[in-house]
Amino acid sequence: TIWVGTGESANRNSSAWGDGIYKSEDGGKTFNNMGLESTHQIAEIEIHPKNSNIVYAAAIGHLWGYSGERGLFRTLDGGSSWEKVLGGLPDDGKTGCTEIIFHPNNPDIIFAGFYHRLRQPASFVSGGEEGGLFKSVDAGKTWKKITNGLAKGKSGMIDISIHLDNPDIMVMAYEADEKIPDGEPGTGVYISYDGGESWKFLLKHAVRPFYHGQIEIDPINPDNIYVVSRGFMISNDGGKSFYQRRWRTDGGDDHDMWIAPYDNKIMYLATDQGSRLSVDAGKTWLSHNNMAIGQYYAIGVDMRDPYYVGGGLQDNGLWMTPSNSREFRGILNMHSTWIAEGDGFHTQIDPEDWRTVYTVNHVGFVARQNIETREYTFITPTPETITNFTDFVEYDYDETRNRYTIDPGEHWFFRERPDRPLLPPQFRFNWSSPFIISSNNSKRVFFGSNHLFQSNDRGDNWKIISPDLTTNDKNLRNTSDGGGLTNSNTGGENHFTIVTISDTPIDKDIIWVGTDDGNVQITRNNGTNWKNVRLNMDDVPLKTWVSRVEASKHKKGR
């Protein structure tokens, strides 16, 4: 029997929701929906070790609103019916359950983690007073909140791991307010030696708990503790010391880990790119790249015959793949060509020269390259390459330290990396910033932030050809740290941005853009004047994400 909970419990603003919990009784050949459809996201499932009809489901609930069901649910009849478990657990309609785990020797002892979070287009509530760690010793009838040794105040995401041979030893990844002073228990790793009644703070560690935040204790040797995030924090002395190790799993972000209870050298990792297996305690890894789980954001095509399709994937770079091959087995993995790193997004190929390819990485990094010679040039608009930059922003540049200020010296902005452009904070770039090649002139390109940029020399120089085309509602603008207990703004939270651009071969001066906050803007004179035509659209809610605008190539005005 296999149980599957649907909906992504990692709280990115791109997280998908599901339709409840599924059950298979034939080893996965067929599945039946067993209910809990309105929970949207189920974070954990635990089956009673002595009675398989008793199943607990940790429902974190709707990410984008306080509707639907959330909390801890239980079935006593194999899923035919469900009840919400209360008895002291949060029931405020805002706090969901993210963790449920049985004591390995006594299933009457259960631990649950609760978490309050809410995403809005330009903000993120992560953490609250009602959440935290809860323990039951009477099979879930009553619960008490555990606070001894833990950080004071609000709590966020929680993950727990219990040692199998000695269940008194437990470890926990616990999110708290990052403003807690150093030296006091805060966000990071905790350990318990008395079955979860009290906790000791071991390590301050906060790498996007809402997205990573997993922890595992070696089932055989409790001295080995693994904190799973972007890379690992590892202890081999029971938490007295930790070191960071970026295992060469080639998986991008790591999200979950399983260690075989019978052999602690066997480990599985769940990553953005698939599963990884180690049989030597992480020294080497085998990548299972045979899963069809690639997540494309956007694609482009060239004019070769056979044509190539280029596209960017979540944490798997940007690739180009032919539409045909001479291989009798068809198109194989080896026919694809890696062209850029990171989170990959828009890929555009010069229609007159297939060797010239434009690639976009997350949050506004765009590059031009010759895919034959591998000559690579970053062309993101910067104060140095925007010809009319000072018409929009006044700034002073400190060349000796590669930084600039917009408020004479009060706040300095540094280049993120030496090989990457300097992005002024006035320009808000979407996680997937739109880039197109003009349908009128292959040397003309457009790039969107909250303003529209135009280049007539393939991105070497830029001109801002619009005001802020978004609503730029300052009352809704995100905080710089994302709004969570710990810094959660990784760029994906940027809002009030342009997300789609289109021009038309019928008239080189007509350009359309759509924004993530509902605007549809058009210029008929190459940016001199703009008109928001959003209100001309009936029956479409305000602030709706305009995912695509496509100007007709055949009829003017359409």
Language model regions located:
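Beta-propeller blade termini and top-face loops
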Residues: 1-558
